[in-house]
Curated annotation (Swiss-Prot):
Position of the signal peptide: none
Molecular-function GO terms, alphabetical: rRNA binding; tRNA (uracil(54)-C5)-methyltransferase activity, S-adenosyl methionine-dependent; tRNA binding
Positions with a binding annotation for S-adenosyl-L-methionine: 186, 214, 219, 235, 295
Catalytic residues (positions): 320, 354
Listed name of the protein: tRNA/tmRNA (uracil-C(5))-methyltransferase
Class of enzymatic activity (EC top level): transferase
Known catalytic reactions: uridine(54) in tRNA + S-adenosyl-L-methionine = 5-methyluridine(54) in tRNA + S-adenosyl-L-homocysteine + H(+); uridine(341) in tmRNA + S-adenosyl-L-methionine = 5-methyluridine(341) in tmRNA + S-adenosyl-L-homocysteine + H(+)
Keywords, alphabetical: Methyltransferase, S-adenosyl-L-methionine, Transferase, tRNA processing
Record-stated family: Belongs to the class I-like SAM-binding methyltransferase superfamily. RNA M5U methyltransferase family. TrmA subfamily.
GO cellular component terms attached to this protein's record: cytosol
InterPro entries for the chain: MeTrfase_TrmA_AS, MeTrfase_TrmA_CS, SAM-dependent_MTases_sf, TrmA_MeTrfase, U5_MeTrfase_fam
Length: 362
């Protein structure tokens, strides 16, 4: 993880530059003015990863300048990370400095926290983990009030839970999420909550069904399910699928069907190219899809999946790469127009931005 340059005094100007860049990318499609959702200036990042660097006979948190993995910058605190992470950093460092068992061949530390205060720490080692390590790790987890995961080659030891529990409020309703260690979650919780509320409002109240591609742990699935008759959601990651199923059950939602298929495979299924055993018991023809929600990886949608979305009246698209978003919109522009668009500043002090668009059929 490279070291970001935090300068709150420059935040407004940097956000304006991002908004201008998004406007430039969407200008060929006659997009309306983007709604801009800012980030907290500090303590916004709910997860952080540090390498350990030996200096002066001790291990220290370290990060690196972009493009230089050999020049370590020692870290004592991390202002972009959540207050909970900043509380835990010195406590954990004191623990490994006091214990040869905890520090021996420890090379990486990961923190995962939530807006609701939950925390999980992952310790990664270049050695096998034994009973002595587990005993000290159990005491450490109790002392810090966290769950803890130890990782070494081919082995994982979980103390407490291997996930954190988050609560996000959308349109006045609180949704509970399990966010697993090692799986993708939105790093900026405050902005994530703004994204969920925007998507919920943009979709509107529908009397038909929603298809969701790339659903992850159900981050958007849960609130959007309250806006439609039924949801068919797809995800390829086994860890994310299991978390999504637990989240659906924890929130008492009974109108969501989740299948472990890639977007490309679902496209084949809907086009009746070939059957899939993982769709056994699901009658695709019983769905009346009026909308599709997509939150693809940085590469955007592949051309076939993009063509699939064309058949829907409404396309709600969250993008972590507006460059590929614009490419996908160009493919759809002859049949769909942009009704709403938004910029979500998930990653302050970087050039990265998250965008949302609602496309409706012309």
């Amino acid at each position: 993880m490279p070291l970001p340059q935090l300068d709150p005094a420059q935040y407004a100007a940097q956000l304006a530059e991002k908004a201008a860049r998004l406007e430039e990318l969407l200008a060929p499609f006659d997009a309306p003015a983007a709604e801009v959702f800012d980030s907290p200036r500090e303590h916004y990042r709910l997860r952080a990863e540090f390498r350990l660097w030996r200096e002066g006979g001790q291990r220290h948190y370290a990060m690196f300048e972009q493009g230089d993995k050999h020049k370590a910058i020692l870290i004592d605190d991390f202002p972009i990370a959540s207050r909970r992470i900043n509380e835990l950093m010195p406590q954990l460092k004191a623990a490994w400095q006091a214990s040869e068992v905890l520090s021996f061949k420890l090379f990486q530390v990961e923190f995962l926290t939530t807006l609701s205060g939950d925390a999980l720490i992952t310790l990664a080692y270049h050695r096998p983990l034994d009973e002595a390590w587990q005993a000290e790790a159990e005491q450490l987890a109790a002392d810090l009030g966290v769950s803890l995961v130890g990782r070494s080659k081919g082995k994982r030891i979980v103390i407490g839970r291997d996930y954190v529990e988050e609560q996000l409020v959308v349109a006045g309703r609180s949704f509970r999420y399990r966010q697993p260690e090692g799986a993708f979650t939105q790093p900026n919780g405050e902005v994530c909550q703004k994204m969920l509320n925007w998507a919920h409002e943009a979709l509107g109240e529908r009397d038909d069904d929603l298809l969701e591609l790339y659903c992850g742990n159900g981050n958007f699935t849960l609130p959007l399910a309250t806006r439609v008759r039924r949801v068919l959601a797809t995800e390829i990651s086994k860890t994310s699928v299991n978390a999504a199923l637990a989240n659906i059950e924890d929130n008492g939602l009974d109108n969501i069907e989740l299948v472990r298929l890639s977007a490309e495979e679902l496209t084949q299924a809907l086009n009746e190219v070939r059957p899939f055993r993982r769709l056994a018991g699901i009658d695709l023809k019983s769905y009346s899809f009026g909308s599709v929600f997509v939150d693809p990886p940085r590469a955007g949608m592949d051309p076939d999946t993009c063509e699939l979305t064309r058949r829907f009246e409404r396309i709600l698209y969250i993008s972590c790469n507006p460059e590929t978003l614009a490419q996908n919109i160009a493919q759809l522009a002859d049949t769909h127009r942009i009704e709403r668009c938004a910029l979500f500043d998930q990653f302050p002090y970087t050039h990265h931005m998250e965008a949302g668009v609602l496309l409706v059929r012309r």
